[in-house]
Amino acid sequence: MVETAVILAGGEGNRLKPLTEEVPKALLKVAGRELLYRTIKQLQDVGVKNFVIVVNKKFEGKVKAFLKEHNFEAEVIPNEHPEKENGYSLYLAKGRIKGEFAVVMSDHIYEKAFLEKAVEGKGLIVDRLGLYINKNEATKVKCEEGRIKYIGKNLEKYDGFDTGFFVLDESIFEVAEEALKEQKKLTMSELAKRAQIPCTEVSGYFWMDVDTPEDVEKAKKYLVKTAIKGVGDGFISRNLNRKVSTRISPYLVDKFTPNQLTVLTFLLGMFSALVAYFSPALGGILLQINSMLDGLDGEVARAQMRTTKFGAWLDSVLDRYVDFAFLSALAMHLKPSWDFMPWVFAALFGSVMVSYSTERYKGAYCEDAYAVIKELRYLLGKRDERIFMIMIFTILGWIKALFVVLAIITNLRVILTIYLVWKKKGNV
């Protein structure tokens, strides 16, 4: 596996203007994060430790400031002739690298699963399927006996698409040097063909190059769409809430931080509790809207690569406030008799304990309960399901029945959770 990567960021980004008038393409934000940040962090996640970044000379200062701001260690090489293309940019790294290394374009976005396989390949990483790209615009590759034979956008017969990711060794610099003696410009495609480097297929994963403003929007939508929670969502979240929130997140991901969205949805939840005291039906509808928006902070955090333990903790704490406040407001509106109060208290404490039981598991065992104890995913009573139930019952005016049902479902779920945790971890 390679431990060094050369990131080519020496171009001028003409097709992205006016977005690249003041910043280099590598520092352009897509879904709230700079392309260069995404590239470095994701390569670090798959084992790359050393970075060499070739940048346009006029943006050298901005790139160095960016690296310092984010505590990234990298050697920066200025390219005073960006018009000589990206093959020349790679040549500038000659003498700075030993052994095998990866080469990646700064304007490409890859999913982690792609990178995990790509760093184990050789030569040009080729995608046979090209599921997420414009195939007419993409650079095509024809391989013969495992090596590049032809490469270009206009090939009629080809084996796959150039992903912009290479795994090379020092011999590539000799080929580049010979080529530059014969010509003034050198692209990576020309260099790859001239060196007849190997082809390695990695197909079916997301990757794309961000070449135009339209590409920025396309990449943003994909990053948000794939930023939903892996496990733990209930039936309503999977089939309703996330279908709504993932359509809203692309409009917010460049404007808000995750914690800002956490606070805003908390305020909406508390407002729904206030409304519920006067109008339970309207309050229930507002609470369901709040539930549909509650995933925005997590989606934005994952799309922006800003997930933090504090953010998850804050979201969990504020959700408990909303749950308790809303049911308390309903109880005050109901003005229950003393003999009904046990149902009210059981519903209140049960609703809080459902979430507390799984959160406390995470604190005790340092792992997600839903990922380890799969039976928990199918137990009725998760927060999204309770809120949807609250909306239905309040619209129908069945407030007393709501407290009874919540009391039974939530506390039964907690009892079953205790049993399942004991069964899985009782001896730990």
From Swiss-Prot:
Residues that coordinate or bind Mg(2+): E116
Entry membrane topology: Multi-pass membrane protein
A GO biological-process term: phospholipid biosynthetic process
Residues bound to CTP: L8, A9, G10, K25, E80, E116
Enzyme Commission code(s) on record: 2.7.7.74, 2.7.8.34
Entry keyword Transmembrane: yes
Its job: Involved in biosynthesis of di-myo-inositol phosphate (DIP), a widespread organic solute in microorganisms adapted to hot environments. Catalyzes the condensation of CTP and L-myo-inositol-1-phosphate into CDP-L-myo-inositol, as well as the biosynthesis of di-myo-inositol-1,3'-phosphate-1'-phosphate (DIPP) from CDP-L-myo-inositol and L-myo-inositol-1-phosphate.
Identification of the protein by name: Bifunctional IPC transferase and DIPP synthase
Organism encoding this protein: Aquifex aeolicus (strain VF5)
Organism lineage: Bacteria, Pseudomonadati, Aquificota, Aquificia, Aquificales
